[in-house]
Swiss-Prot record:
The gene is recX. GO terms for cellular component: cytoplasm. Its main location: cytoplasm. This is Regulatory protein RecX. It is found in: Cytoplasm. Belongs to the RecX family. It comes from Herbaspirillum seropedicae. Modulates RecA activity. One of its GO terms (biological process) is regulation of DNA repair. It holds the Pfam family RecX_HTH3. InterPro entries: RecX_HTH_1st, RecX_HTH_2nd, RecX_HTH_3rd, Regulatory_RecX, WH-like_DNA-bd_sf. PANTHER family: REGULATORY PROTEIN RECX FAMILY PROTEIN (PTHR33602:SF1).
Length: 154
């Protein structure tokens, strides 16, 4: 006997149980399964009122997952792509800006084991950080501080 189809509400809760989703992302995932008469907007409203769906939690989760590997520009662009805007972005932007140079230095040390020997290698390493979304200022600071700790035997 075939299984009965999963309701839209159950499917939404299943998605949210695995990880946080933005409102836009969840609506996109649920749209192909919506039957005639299903109201995705009402379901999303109910999920937000029940605190199953939260833009703040999603934003914090995405930043936490991406901050160790990517720069502010990349993270903020990804948040915009998920439909996060307004005050939530402004708060996260301020938090992210504080440690971007340090994060860039960590990414640089993780990828490249030694400081650049020549201009070509330095340009390659700078392009790598730019592709990861780090600002020019943060990249400059990262090159100044990335390998200072290695000289210290302590």
């Amino acid at each position: 006997m075939p299984r009965p189809p999963i309701s839209l509400k159950a499917r939404a809760l299943k998605y949210l149980s695995s990880r946080e989703h933005s409102r836009l992302e969840l609506a996109r995932k649920l749209a192909p399964y919506a039957q005639e008469g299903d109201d995705i907007e009402a379901l999303l409203q109910w999920l937000e009122q029940s605190r199953f769906l939260s833009q703040e939690r999603f934003s914090e989760s995405l930043v936490h997952r991406r901050a160790a590997r990517y720069g502010n520009q990349r993270i903020l662009s990804e948040l915009h792509g998920h439909g996060i805007e307004g005050e939530a972005i402004a708060d996260l932007k301020a938090d992210l800006a504080a440690g971007e140079a340090e994060r860039a230095a960590q990414v640089l040390r993780r990828k490249f084991t030694a400081p650049p020997a020549d201009a070509e290698t330095r340009a390659k390493q700078m392009r790598f950080l730019q592709q990861r979304g780090f600002s020019h200022r943060s990249i400059r600071e990262a090159f100044q501080t990335a390998w200072l700790d290695e000289d210290d035997p302590s």
